[in-house]
Amino acid sequence: MKFIKDILLFQIETTGPIIDRDSIIQLSAVLLDKDNLLEKNFFNSYIKVSFLDNTISQHATQLMVPFETLQKSPKLHDVIRAFIAKFGSTPLLATHSVSNVQFLRQAFKKTFLPYEYDSHVLDLWSLGYVYTLHYGLKKMPTMQTLFQHFNLKQTNPHDALEKARLSAEVFRKIVNG
């Protein structure tokens, strides 16, 4: 199946679930070609949200990455600028969670950068739900359910880039059959 636009499938890791209080600590994305859904490019950055070593240490433990990785990470403003520079705002955004979109919008707002993506977002959860209904799967279509169904191995459930790549594979399998 061919699409009108390239698809930018993104995933995030956050300090918690509350958009107004918590922060993105990893932003990752894979750009899928509109013609064949193969990965054209990718983006991955951890985000330093605190200068306190104990807070950074907690985030590093949560993400299962070395403390030094987060300590040396760029701030949110720099990450969002790099994200825009890499992909622009023309691809169609895709993600597995509406809250991911809300967190991304909030990140743009916090950095005073314009959020210029199309208001239409490809919702992988809904696509997965329809797929599971069609094939009679009895589980809710979480990403883990779909990873298991398609025999995809996830090594770190808190790695946004790994989740983005596995989500892209799920998307390809659902769309291409």
Model-identified regions with their sequence ranges:
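Acidic, Mg2+-coordinating catalytic module of metal-dependent nucleases/exonucleases
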Residues: 91-98, 103-108, 141-177
